[in-house]
């Protein structure tokens, strides 16, 4: 076979092809290093003897549709200059890998647009071979995110499996990179992050998180000088949960069958942003439901008013709006609203801190959506470390892996 084909297509530069044969549908190239190119693997001397050889097989990039192997005759070298007795270097493969570097690069190229399952089928190798190549690449490029430049971070959780199995992630809000992945969603989930952060803790200026008491306690303990910010996303999300809880309670209490039907069919309209309901029929349906039930109407309009806390021109005006909202919720005597008011009052300082730093968890919620897609792409994950590395590389748009 032409030497340039071996060099350019297969990534083999020092060896010559001695023979070509087929094993079923598979193509096998028999290669070896010419005598004049053999040298000591330690000192590079050509003052050597060959003390035997053996055949080592490598998976190479396919030629056409044929799975291709390289059977290389690897010589044992005895050097007269340095005295070593070792096998010759195989520069087209890494260490004891059974595939060539060119094959690994092809796997990584395919990983930009194909799943592990697709790649393993196309290249006729096992799922684990593809996963291990990806993992080696991820470990060398993403295993130790730089924490020294962190200034503003966000903390959140996501479910790894159905049920209550969670992981905690920390995101650099200035570049959108995941910099830490912790097991579970409690206070201890961040222990590894604090340990890795070390003296760089003093550089953290602000932390955005949800209404989790575990996270707020952990941040207050380890980052006493950082501002803690609770953004509108999680407050609004909690308010929507309270509104839906009230809707279900009212549905169970309502005796009139027709009114029950009206309440049951309005969940989507109640939870949606009122300014986004443009359909005239939907608007009439919502107003009809609210007119039939005063507690539901109060809760709905308080939900709509809640976002005004983040629409003020100053922190002082936002404080006044927040205090007035809490007052109205308490005076309503509606239990879910009173609980919501209690929560907002408890997190008042953190909510208003948004006006000092203007950070939200919007970035991290977008990342959570990417994580859902990632889990589908890899058909679940069989290796915790591999999954974490995939998360660390999630921001790199040039990679599908």
Which stretches of residues belong to each language-model region?
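Short, conserved DNA-binding cores of transcription-related domains
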Residues: 1-84, 89-90
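Short, flexible, glycine/charge-rich loop motifs used to bind or transfer phosphoryl groups or to couple energy/partner
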Residues: 30, 142-144, 194-198
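Acidic/histidine-rich catalytic cores and adjacent linkers
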Residues: 33, 37, 42, 162-164, ...
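The DNA-recognition helices of helix-turn-helix-type DNA-binding domains
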Residues: 47, 126, 137-141, 211, ...
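Short, positively charged, Gly/Tyr-enriched micro-motifs
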Residues: 57-164, 201-204, 217, 351-352
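Active-site beta-loop-alpha junctions of metal-dependent nucleic acid enzymes
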Residues: 96-99, 178-200
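Short, surface-exposed amphipathic charged segments that create phosphate/polyanion-binding patches used
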Residues: 240-251
